[in-house]
A protein has these predicted regions:
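Ligand-binding cleft/hinge of the Venus flytrap
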Residues: 7-13, 91-115, 145-149
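Extracytoplasmic small-molecule ligand-binding "clamshell" domains
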Residues: 1-42, 188, 197
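Short helix-initiation/N-cap motifs at beta->coil->alpha
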Residues: 18-29, 112-124, 162
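Short beta-strand-centered segments that line the small-molecule binding cleft or hinge
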Residues: 28-42, 49-62, 155
Length: 216
């Protein structure tokens, strides 16, 4: 649904959005290097990432784990388990390292984090039983479950709720342009229609913001 939102922003501005598929952890360096104008990839806005780029906030999401159907996995008690993630995501860089450290500090086995270049690969690893669980942002996990509901299911509830943001080069005038355009889409109902189409209304916002993570 990120693509639908980006297309709506482009349409409102009278421009056509051009897309380049990239590994998640290459997107921010490509923005700061001038290769991409925007990064639209379900980015969790964090204070650390705000040091490199600005974020136009458009959604609130959390982390949601998934496990194979019928298997019980507790995200808060995952020591020694194999967990799939997409490389460079919040789950890879923040959530799982912290959880794994808690395990080892308590004398337990570390979480075995299996990193994949794409979310589809991480999901497939779970479907095939190569890992015990996967961790991803809640809309991503919910979508994966909807497509593989006979094989995987949610493990626990959504946690660590945080703002999503469209990444823009630090200090670029484009940031305010995107924010104002997003607000126009919220006000005219287009934004809600997109969220409803994809079944992700729960994290919708009523006002666009910039760098919300540093304001929390």
């Amino acid at each position: 649904w990120d693509v639908d939102l980006a297309n709506a922003i482009g349409a409102k501005l009278g421009v056509t959005v051009e897309y380049t598929i990239s590994k998640f952890d290459n997107i921010i360096p490509s923005i700061t290097g001038g290769r991409y104008g925007l990064g639209v990839s379900s980015f969790t806005d964090t204070v650390e990432r705000e040091k490199q780029v600005d974020f136009v906030n458009y959604y609130n999401a959390g982390v949601l784990w998934a496990a194979q159907k019928g298997k019980t996995v507790d995200p808060d008690n995952a020591c020694g388990l194999k967990v799939a993630v997409e490389a460079g995501t919040y789950e890879d860089t923040d959530e799982l390292p912290a959880k794994s450290k808690t395990c080892t500090d308590a004398g337990k086995q570390a979480i075995q984090v299996l990193k994949f270049d794409g979310q589809d690969q991480a999901t497939n690893a779970l479907v095939l039983g190569q890992v015990d669980a996967m961790s991803a942002d809640s809309p991503i996990t919910e979508y994966a479950i909807s497509k593989q509901s006979d094989k995987i299911e949610a493990a626990g509830k959504t946690f660590d709720i945080a703002p999503y943001g469209i990444a823009v080069n630090k200090g670029a005038p484009l940031t305010d342009v995107i924010k104002n355009t997003l607000q126009a889409l919220i006000d005219d109902g287009t934004y809600t229609k997109i969220l409803t189409k994809w079944g992700v209304q729960d994290g919708g916002v009523t006002a666009a913001d910039v760098n919300a993570a540093s304001k929390q």
